[in-house]
Design a protein with these regions (language model features):
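Active-site nucleophilic cysteine motif
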Residues: 312-319, 348-364
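Alpha-helical solenoid scaffolds that mediate protein-protein interactions
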Residues: 41-42
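Intrinsically disordered, low-complexity N-terminal segments that are enriched in acidic
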Residues: 27, 47-50, 60-267
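Acidic low-complexity segments
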Residues: 18-19, 26-30, 35, 236-245, ...
Length: 484
């Protein structure tokens, strides 16, 4: 391979792994030393053979290994910003949110796998959103909450009503208007402008990508109603990750925004209600490194779950059941820092919507069932959040949906009929921007993205460097949601 100019393509080599010494330093949380070891390896001279026996057949080094090291270096640089709370700080954060929380309780939760943590420079640190996982998914912690709990009853009632309508009428539709935007945070912009002036420039050169609704089977009558300023490019309606793109030289900070509307239609499908064709298609059944990979652990799990089963619909149902009944919802760090997502999900039995979707997709593909990614926003009255889900294909019916995280949520709520609903069907409260995982933008973003795999809130590149974390400021809002 030749090293791609798009740094996000380097992630396809992530599974090349780390040298043993760097791997041990990473596991122990000594990130600065690990970065130093990586830098030393990247600087090695490969023009001469290590054993002095003639010309080296790889005079520039092993390109896949070099790409993996460059990605791992950036992962190591970003990890400390994901795991920010010492144990004492984590206890104090929980004590401010629930009654009677103790250090012993935190450590018990760590041992049980309910609190995500890592070592950072030798000190145990908890994930920045660990408290949200506990309060949002564990009724015992919700009952100890200080102050009123969010009302989930109305949302559950809407899901029941939507399910009933879809069963009765075969589909449900909604007309939706969303406004969204992204830009640099003020602090990041001021720092970038100061660097530019120190280099003799008067402005920060910005490139911005904002997700837009894409043309797909469920989305129609898409209207791009307003932009804060004309985009330099709007990607094709059927782009795998559709965006509006701006490029500008800024002397003062500003956000780039869009308002759009569309009709979303969710058809009802029961994958077990028809007889599958004896021969199924082979598209969307391959591996896509670094995450959709047929590891021995996943092959073994898929074989166990489908033992004695020949129907592709029943195989897919068993994968869905395994995930929705076993994988506990956990907020995740940035996907940038995650490795081997489906294997970790299947073994650790925890993850968020995207983690569960990737696990379902990979298990389906191992079993020869076409499966693919879809993502964007989950929208509704007063609601607009990021969301991912999966699609799978069984002839003669065609593409159907699997929303494993919603299914797991319904399992926790004791709503078995709704859990089954999300195997085959979803709901119209969606905005689909991405129809493929790990797809390039149009035009491509060459620097590291905040998320090299998905695009839900947008990406910003300043003076050639991709921004992430608190360097960007994004918003999204559902302006109207009308059931049709």
């Amino acid at each position: 391979m030749t090293m791609p100019a798009d740094q996000n393509e380097w992630f396809r080599c992530l599974n090349a792994g780390l040298p043993d010494d760097v791997s041990r330093l990473k596991a122990a949380g000594y990130y600065e030393e690990a970065i130093g070891r990586i830098d030393a390896r990247l600087a090695e001279d490969w023009t001469a053979s290590q054993n002095g026996a003639g010309a080296n057949p790889a005079p520039a080094g092993v390109e896949a290994q070099r790409a993996a090291l460059l990605v791992q270096r950036e992962i190591l640089r970003r990890l400390p910003a994901e795991y920010i709370y010492t144990e004492q700080q984590a206890v104090e954060k929980m004590q401010a949110r629930v009654t009677g929380f103790t250090l012993e309780e935190l450590r018990a939760l760590e041992r049980a796998g309910w609190v995500d943590w890592r070592f950072v420079e030798g000190e145990k640190r908890c994930l920045d959103r660990f408290d949200e996982t506990l309060l949002d998914t564990d009724p015992a912690f919700a009952a100890r909450r200080r102050g009123p709990a969010p009302d989930s009853g109305a949302a559950l009632a809407r899901r029941r009503a939507t399910h009933a309508k879809m069963v009765r009428e075969g589909a449900a539709s909604a007309r939706i208007t969303v406004e969204a935007g992204i830009g640099m945070s003020d602090a990041a912009f001021e720092a970038a402008l100061a660097r530019a002036r120190a280099q003799g420039r008067s402005a920060v050169h910005l490139r911005v990508w904002l997700p837009l609704p894409a043309a797909c089977a469920s989305q129609s009558d898409i209207r791009l109603e307003h932009f804060s300023e004309p985009p330099a490019r709007i990607a094709a309606a059927d782009a795998p990750q559709r965006t509006a793109y701006w490029e500008a030289d800024l002397t003062a900070n500003r956000r780039f925004t869009a308002r759009y509307s569309y009709t979303q239609t969710a058809p009802y499908a029961d994958p077990l209600s028809f007889v599958p064709d004896p021969v199924q298609p082979a598209f969307d059944t391959g591996e896509e490194a670094p995450h959709i990979v047929f590891t021995p652990a996943l092959r073994a799990l898929a074989a166990q779950l489908t033992r004695g089963v020949t129907s592709p619909a029943e195989k897919a149902r068993r994968f869905y059941d395994y995930i929705t009944r076993n994988v506990h919802y956990h907020y995740q760090p940035s996907y940038f820092v995650l490795e081997d997502i489906p294997t970790r999900c299947a073994m650790d039995r925890r993850g968020d919507c995207g983690v569960m979707a990737l696990t379902f997709i990979t298990l389906c593909r191992i079993a020869g069932i076409p499966a693919r990614w879809q993502s964007g926003l989950a929208v509704g009255p007063g609601k607009c959040g990021c969301h991912d889900w999966a699609m799978f294909y069984i002839a003669p019916r065609g593409w159907m949906y699997a929303d494993c995280s919603y299914g797991a949520s319904m399992a926790r709520a004791g709503e078995e009929e709704l859990r089954r609903h999300y195997f085959g069907s979803i709901d119209p409260g969606r905005m689909v921007a991405n129809r493929a995982f790990q797809a390039a933008f149009d035009p491509p973003m060459l620097g590291f993205r905040a998320d090299p795999y998905d695009n839900q809130t947008g990406e910003v590149e300043a003076d050639g460097a991709g921004l992430w974390g608190e360097q960007t400021a994004a918003f999204k809002e559902t302006l109207s949601y009308e059931e049709l």
